Design a protein with these regions (language model features):
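Short amphipathic alpha-helical segments
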Residues: 111, 123-131, 139, 143
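Membrane-interfacial helix-loop-helix
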Residues: 1-19, 53, 57-114, 118-125, ...
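Short amphipathic alpha-helical surface patches that mediate protein-protein
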Residues: 80, 132-133
């Protein structure tokens, strides 16, 4: 039933998913992995990647704007002394530094969205660096979600984690 619904209402589901992704990031301060897995499961590898990247970038930009207006003093108080030496470098080429910052994995999503308020990054630079910088991580997670859909369709029972990890459909 779910697959029929998914195939018949792809545009509507895409709009709801995009809105849900934006809401997931901004007010709830969620991270992107569950959304990326769900996007791959529902939409497949390519459409899921585009929707998740767009939704997470918009949500992250809203979170950055919120932090810039309401949390800037608190963030500067907590973190400025640790990142004082980067402030001048960031101002010279903020897009490239932010892009490298977004390519790095392992930084909690909330911190990676709020920390650039220290350097007064322009909103357009933040949005486009986020849009480009999260592509590799999100593509991998969406591919895993897409592979999960294929594994679930093929098996009548719930697969083990080792079955999921070593299935070639996840990586292709």
């Amino acid at each position: 039933y779910f697959l029929e619904l998914k195939n018949s209402n792809l545009f509507l589901i895409s709009i709801f998913f995009l809105l849900f992704t934006i809401l997931w990031v901004f007010p709830f301060l969620g991270f992107g992995s569950p959304i990326a897995l769900l996007g791959g499961f529902i939409f497949g590898k390519w459409i899921g990647t585009v929707l998740v990247i767009l939704g997470l970038s918009i949500g992250a930009t809203f979170l950055y704007i919120f932090g810039n207006y309401f949390l800037k003093d608190l963030i500067r108080e907590k973190f400025l002394n640790k990142f004082q030496n980067l402030e001048n470098k960031f101002k010279k080429s903020e897009f490239y530094y932010l892009l490298i910052y977004r390519f790095l994995g392992g930084i909690p999503w909330q911190i990676s969205c709020l920390l650039p308020t220290l350097f007064n990054v322009r909103i357009t630079n933040f949005f486009f660096a986020t849009l480009i910088g999260i592509i590799p991580q999100i593509f991998l997670a969406v591919s895993i979600g897409s592979g999960l859909e294929k594994i679930i369709e093929q098996n009548s029972k719930v697969p083990n984690i080792s079955d999921i990890i070593f299935t070639p459909t996840i990586y292709i």
